[in-house]
Amino acid sequence: MLRAATNLYSPPNTGKMSPKTIGSDVGIEVIPVMTGTFLSGAMMSLFLLTIPVILETTTVPSQLLNQWHRIFYRGHIQGPLISIATGLLYSYAAYQRSQRGAAWKPFAVSAAVTVAMIPFTWVFMANVNNSLFRAVAVTEKGGEGNWNEAQGLVRSWGAWNAVRALFPLSGAVLGLLSTCKIVSF
């Protein structure tokens, strides 16, 4: 009877990976999933919280454009850095998996999808960004700016940013599904 109770706490060796091995493998794979999810959440919070609040509480075009410009300035430095770091972490996880003979391609795809937000910005958001920069330049020279134009541009930028946030989120979902061994290719 005592032996049976002991076996409850010490399961027999089934030939599977030990908890120590599983933990170290999962740790390498979970870190980029966490950073990708963090990046997507930070970006999505702009669309869901920040942009609506500044649109609801700002009545002067120059102030709205200045607030957007500060958001852009911080994001254009931090976002790509986190995206690239996350892509490198996914690449490292893919490399580690390939060394073990495990399915590594989902992590390579996660890396590519996460970093794809950068060229997406250059290609699809350049027009709205440039229009906003021109509007900001007008207000910096003492002009008031046009409320409807400023509001429309900031709304458009927020929507494009929400789409862009789906890149690191997609990478994180694929990375998580691969970590849990639900997806493999």
Swiss-Prot record:
Q: Which GO terms describe its molecular function?
A: monooxygenase activity
User: How does the entry describe its membrane topology?
Assistant: Multi-pass membrane protein
Q: What class of enzyme is it?
A: oxidoreductase
UniProt-annotated glycosylation sites, renumbered to this chain: N129
| Alphabetical UniProt keywords | Glycoprotein, Membrane, Monooxygenase, Oxidoreductase, Transmembrane, Transmembrane helix
The terms describing its cellular component in GO are: membrane
Q: Which InterPro entries match?
A: Anthrone_oxy
Q: Give the transmembrane ranges.
A: 35-55, 75-95, 106-126, 165-185
What does the induction field say? Expression is positively regulated by the dothistromin-specific transcription factor aflR.
List locations, semicolon-separated: Membrane
Q: According to its UniProt record, in which pathway does this protein act?
A: Mycotoxin biosynthesis
Keyword Lyase annotated: no
Quote the EC number: 1.-.-.-
Family assignment?
A: Belongs to the anthrone oxygenase family.
**What the protein does?**
Monooxygenase; part of the fragmented gene cluster that mediates the biosynthesis of dothistromin (DOTH), a polyketide toxin very similar in structure to the aflatoxin precursor, versicolorin B. The first step of the pathway is the conversion of acetate to norsolorinic acid (NOR) and requires the fatty acid synthase subunits hexA and hexB, as well as the polyketide synthase pksA. PksA combines a hexanoyl starter unit and 7 malonyl-CoA extender units to synthesize the precursor NOR.
Tell me what this protein is called: Monooxygenase hypC
Its lineage reads: Eukaryota, Fungi, Dikarya, Ascomycota, Pezizomycotina
